[in-house]
A protein has these predicted regions:
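Sec-dependent N-terminal signal peptides
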Residues: 4-13
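A short, structured loop/turn motif at beta-sheet edges
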Residues: 93-100, 122-130
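Low-complexity, intrinsically disordered terminal/linker segments enriched in charged
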Residues: 133-159
Length: 159
């Protein structure tokens, strides 16, 4: 009888673990869909959708060191602009153990800038996953880093 109870407990834990694994897979799919929709909305200049995908206290960090846009400031900046096109090439998504937050990194491609990287954080809300922070950067090959950073230093010294 004791073996039976142990077997039942083991089966319950396995079932719970399988459900957790399935939930994580579904969350990763949903987060990927949010990020894809975010990029699609930017490309179309659909600012209503774009900003609805951000949390109320969402922040966008741009490529310029001065660009730290809180959601409402960024909405005003975007205004009637036509948008920007970035296509995700690769993406990695991780969830916190409690499943309430996620972080990601993705390599992007655009006709304007070529390779870039997006990183950020999403939070689970009653309305689904929302982007709490998005950070766009230009990865610099190590062989070019010294030259590029020297150019940035010279630029900053001149301003």
């Amino acid at each position: 009888m004791k073996k039976f109870y142990i077997l039942v407990v083991v089966m319950i834990f396995q079932f719970a673990h399988a459900q957790d694994s399935e939930r994580i897979k579904l969350d990763i799919i949903e987060i990927g869909q949010v990020l894809d929709a975010y990029h699609a909305a930017a490309a179309e200049g659909d600012w209503s959708t774009y900003f609805d995908l951000m949390s109320e206290d969402g922040v966008f960090l741009g490529t310029d060191a001065s660009e730290r846009w809180i959601k409402n400031e960024f909405r005003a900046y975007a205004g009637n602009r036509t948008g920007w096109v970035y296509r995700s090439v690769t993406r990695n998504i991780n969830l916190t153990p409690d499943g309430m937050s996620a972080w990601f990194d993705e390599i992007l491609d655009s006709l304007s800038y070529g390779t870039s990287r997006g990183t950020g954080v999403l939070i689970r809300t009653n309305e689904g996953w929302k982007i709490s922070q998005y950070h766009l950067t230009f990865p610099i090959p190590n062989e070019l880093a010294r030259h590029v950073t020297d150019e940035i230093k010279a630029f900053e010294a001149g301003n």
